[in-house]
Design a protein with these regions (language model features):
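N-terminal secretory signal peptides that target proteins for export/translocation
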Residues: 1-3
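Bacterial Sec-dependent signal peptides at the C-terminal "C-region" and cleavage site
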Residues: 14-25
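Transmembrane beta-barrel domains of Gram-negative outer membranes and organellar outer membranes
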Residues: 23-264
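Bacterial N-terminal signal peptides
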Residues: 5-16
């Protein structure tokens, strides 16, 4: 059985088991405000409401070692299938590189498929989730990893006051680089401040530690503004402070959520 088939089988088995544990009618949380993975590096620790379909989109510009890259649409589709379970689909991103003699080319990246299972709230008031995923090698020849690359993320969050939240994520991935995999650990932490009811700002540190190659240390900050209860605009920027890190990155995004189905 291929890794992709194993992954799909795991999703189906987990979904069937979780269905029996459904605690509320699907659609009961449809009116809750939107909560996105954007624009932080760390993913959100909560799932989208059951029956809701959420699209998160963006455009970024990154400069690294003299090479500037634009990428879009950064689309992530998240479908709530149970009260604490969502399916996740990462649409291939198009990378546009400035012309250089370094051999960089333009094209689409790989597609990703995964799910999020919310475990919290747990002891201590933490919200915690686990996000297994795998990328599928459908991208351009010079951009795709040409492998089925698994990853697991564990995002967490905890409200400190009515307006301050601490959050972060631990993850491990195994991307294909050339003939081998390069197992990479990652950790991030950020602090979010609710400025007004629809407006949040944050600052975040993220570190990636590959098995081969130097560590990537980054600091980013940004804000998100809910133009409607289930629509959001975001803006972010950051910089690296290690040899392997990007010099800087900036980006904008737009996300929306709507109710796709209901059942009891």
């Amino acid at each position: 059985m291929t890794p992709f088939a194993c992954f799909l089988t795991g999703i189906l088995v987990a979904s069937s088991l979780l269905h029996d544990a459904q605690a509320e009618p699907c659609g009961a949380r449809a009116q809750e405000p939107i909560a996105t993975d954007r624009p932080q590096i760390a993913s959100s620790s909560i799932v989208v409401p059951c029956g809701s379909l959420q699209f998160e989109n963006g455009l970024s510009a990154t400069s690294a070692a003299g090479q500037r890259t634009f990428d879009l649409p950064e689309t992530s589709a998240r479908l709530g299938v149970f009260s604490k379970t969502e399916l996740r689909f990462g649409v291939p991103i198009y990378f546009q590189n400035d012309p250089t003699t370094s051999g960089f080319v333009n094209g689409f990246g790989d597609f990703s498929l995964g799910f999020k299972q919310q475990l919290g709230p747990v002891k201590g008031g933490f919200d915690v989730s686990v996000i297994p995923a795998v990328s599928l090698p459908v991208g351009a020849k010079a951009i795709s990893s040409h492998g089925y690359d698994p990853s697991v993320q564990i995002p967490w969050s905890r409200a400190m006051t009515k307006t301050w939240t601490a959050a972060g994520m631990f993850s491990v991935s195994s991307p294909t680089q050339g003939p081998r995999r390069n197992v990479t650990g990652q950790a991030s932490v950020y602090f979010d401040r609710q400025l007004t009811q629809p407006w949040d700002a944050y600052i975040e540190y993220s570190g990636s530690f590959p098995q081969r190659g130097g560590p990537i240390h980054q600091v980013d900050c940004g804000m998100a503004y809910k133009i409607a209860p289930r629509q959001q605009l975001d803006l972010h920027g950051g910089f690296g402070f290690s040899a392997a890190s990007p010099d800087y990155s900036i980006g904008i995004g737009y996300s929306l959520r709507f109710q796709a189905f209901r059942f009891h």
